[in-house]
Swiss-Prot record:
Chain residue ranges for the region called G3: 62-65
Subcellular location: Cytoplasm; Cell inner membrane
GO MF annotation terms: GTP binding; GTPase activity; ribosomal small subunit binding; small ribosomal subunit rRNA binding
Region (G1): 15-22
Location of region: G2: 41-45
GO CC aspect terms: cytosol; plasma membrane
Organism: Enterobacter sp. (strain 638)
Name by which UniProt lists this protein: GTPase Era
Length: 301
C-alpha cells in the first residue's frame, strides 16, 4: 500500500511596519505567538509559526517590518532579518494596509520583484476603510504593480478572508515531508516566548517614546518542584528617566506589566509561573551592534 503524500513549505509574511503582519500570523495559526501592538516595529526577530492540518504543514516566517530608516544598528539588523527571509521561501504574503500606499510599501515591492517566490497580496484592514468606493480603484492600482499570485482583501483582526489566504497557501505547498511534529506551533524556545510576552506588555502599558529603547533579557528560566516555572526578566532601557517610567509610581507600572505577562505565560506554557522583573539602564544598546547580537538580535540573520 502506497504511503500518503505530505506537503510542506515555508511562507514569509512581509510588509512595512504596522500593517498587521503579526496579527495575520496569529490568526492563521489560531493562537498568539507573535507580539502585536498598535506601535510600529513591534516584531524584531523572525518568528516561525507552524500550522499543520492533515497532510499539509505551512511554516510561516513573521518578519520585522521593512522600512527606509536605517540610522540605528537595531533598524539595520531588523531590515536584514526581514530581507533574508524573502530569499529562501516557497511563497510570500505581502501585507499592505487598506487604501494606504507609502514609500516603504514601494521599497518592499521592489525587493519582491527581484525574488523568485510567488507573492500573495494581502490587503489588510479593509474593514477600517472609510470610503468604500476608494477600495476597488486602489485594488486595481495594486494589481498593476506586479504579477501577484492572488489579491485578497481581508481583516486579520476579525478573521475575515484569512481562511482564503490559508487555502491559497495549502494549494501551493510543495510535496515534501513535514519538518516539525504536528503539535508544534513555533520553533522558538519557551525562554524566547517569555521575553516576547514581557516586551508586548511594555508596549501596551507604556508611552509612545519608550518601546524602541527597551528590550528584555530572560536571566533565569527554570522548572520548579510545583510543576511550574520560575522566570526572572531583566528589562533594559537606555536612560534613567525611562527606568522611572517602566517602574511607575510606587512600582505600580511594573507590577501591572508583571501580572499581565504572567497570565499570558501561564496560558501559553499551561503551567503556573512565578515571574520577577527588574529594570536596568544600559545606555546606547540599540546603537551597539555587538550588544544587540548578545541579546539575540543577530541570531536569525
Amino acid at each position: 500500500m502506497s504511503e500518503e503524500k505530505s506537503y510542506c513549505g515555508f511562507i514569509a509574511i512581509v510588509g512595512r511596519p504596522n500593517v498587521g503582519k503579526s496579527t495575520l500570523l496569529n490568526t492563521l495559526l489560531g493562537q498568539k505567538i507573535s507580539i502585536t501592538s498598535r506601535k510600529a516595529q513591534t516584531t524584531r526577530h523572525r518568528i516561525v509559526g507552524i500550522h499543520t492540518e492533515g497532510e499539509y504543514q505551512a511554516i510561516y516566517v513573521d518578519t520585522p517590518g521593512l522600512h527606509m530608516e536605517e540610522k540605528r544598528a537595531i533598524n539595520r539588523l531588523m531590515n536584514k532579518a526581514a530581507s533574508s527571509s524573502i530569499g529562501d521561501v516557497e511563497l510570500i504574503i505581502f501585507v499592505v494596509e487598506g487604501t494606504r500606499w507609502t514609500a516603504d510599501d514601494e521599497m518592499v515591492l521592489n525587493k519582491l520583484r527581484d525574488g523568485r517566490a510567488p507573492v500573495i497580496l494581502a490587503v489588510n484592514k479593509v474593514d477600517n476603510v472609510q470610503e468604500k468606493a476608494d477600495l476597488l480603484p486602489h485594488l486595481q492600482f495594486l494589481a498593476s504593480q506586479m504579477n501577484f499570485l492572488d489579491i485578497v482583501p481581508l481583516s486579520a483582526e476579525s478573521g475575515m478572508n484569512v481562511d482564503t489566504i490559508a487555502g491559497i497557501v495549502r494549494k501551493h505547498l510543495p510535496e515534501a515531508i513535514h519538518h516539525f511534529p504536528e503539535d508544534y506551533i513555533t520553533d522558538r524556545s519557551q525562554r524566547f516566548m517569555a521575553s516576547e510576552i514581557i516586551r508586548e506588555k511594555l508596549m501596551r502599558f507604556l508611552g509612545a517614546e519608550l518601546p524602541y529603547s527597551v528590550t528584555v533579557e530572560i536571566e533565569r528560566f527554570q522548572t520548579n518542584e510545583r510543576g511550574g516555572y520560575d522566570i526572572n526578566g531583566l528589562i533594559l532601557v537606555e536612560r534613567e528617566g525611562q527606568k522611572k517610567m517602566v517602574i511607575g509610581n510606587k512600582g505600580s507600572k511594573i507590577k501591572t506589566i508583571g501580572i499581565e505577562a504572567r497570565k499570558d505565560m501561564q496560558d501559553m506554557f499551561e503551567a503556573p509561573v512565578h515571574l520577577e522583573l527588574w529594570v536596568k539602564v544600559k545606555s546606547g544598546w540599540a546603537d551597539d551592534e555587538r550588544a544587540l547580537r548578545s541579546l539575540g538580535y543577530g541570531d536569525d540573520v
